[in-house]
Amino acid sequence: MTQLSSNDVPSMGRRQFMNLLTFGTATGVALGALYPVANYFMPLRAGGGGGGTSAKDELGNPITKTGWLATHQAGDRSLVQGLKGDPTYLIVNEGGEIGEFGLNAICTHLGCVVPWDSGANKFICPCHGSQYDTNGKVVRGPAPLSLALAHVDIEDDAVLVKQWSETDFRTNENPWWA
């Protein structure tokens, strides 16, 4: 058997080069497409050591208790970014303090964001007319379930939103969202 000298060994051909280029491009696109999927299932969390997520305003800035109470009066229900970035109502109770629970603003019927109607003193879904009382309990369908609850905690003036896994105080049942 004869050995070929280094001058006789063929270099990478055009076909092999195109195969490597195609494989590299496809791999890059696939990895780029998987990043948002992985981020959805394992979101980055901001917050304290208690596992909470820092509530954020419409610009994505963390909310502080003193800043929030300076601009929101008793009985106010305003949207913040809560768990998983979902719109969540932060409630200022009648004592002028931030309530111990927040309400996920996503309607349980078809997923519309449910606005607070201060004149009617309830949440009314603009899509199909579902209505929820001041605590987010469904009072008129077609929504089948109450709005999801979230714990609201204050740690060093930071407003944190945490997963609610206890019994739903509105229905005395296990939470459907946990």
Swiss-Prot record:
Cellular component GO terms held in the UniProt record: plasma membrane-derived thylakoid membrane
A Gene Ontology BP annotation from the UniProt entry: photosynthesis
Membrane topology: Single-pass membrane protein
Rieske domain: residues covered: 65-161
Enzyme Commission number: 7.1.1.6
This protein's UniProt keywords: 2Fe-2S, Disulfide bond, Electron transport, Iron, Iron-sulfur, Membrane, Metal-binding, Thylakoid, Translocase, Transmembrane, Transmembrane helix, Transport
Required co-factors: [2Fe-2S] cluster
Major subcellular location class: membrane
Residues involved in [2Fe-2S] cluster binding: 107, 109, 125, 128
Localization per Swiss-Prot or TrEMBL: Cellular thylakoid membrane
Cysteine disulfide links: 112-127
Family recorded in the similarity comment: Belongs to the Rieske iron-sulfur protein family.
Function: Component of the cytochrome b6-f complex, which mediates electron transfer between photosystem II (PSII) and photosystem I (PSI), cyclic electron flow around PSI, and state transitions.
Quaternary state and interactors: The 4 large subunits of the cytochrome b6-f complex are cytochrome b6, subunit IV (17 kDa polypeptide, PetD), cytochrome f and the Rieske protein, while the 4 small subunits are PetG, PetL, PetM and PetN. The complex functions as a dimer.
PANTHER family: CYTOCHROME B-C1 COMPLEX SUBUNIT RIESKE, MITOCHONDRIAL
Miscellaneous notes: The Rieske iron-sulfur protein is a high potential 2Fe-2S protein.
Name of this chain's protein: Cytochrome b6-f complex iron-sulfur subunit
Species this protein is from: Prochlorococcus marinus (strain AS9601)
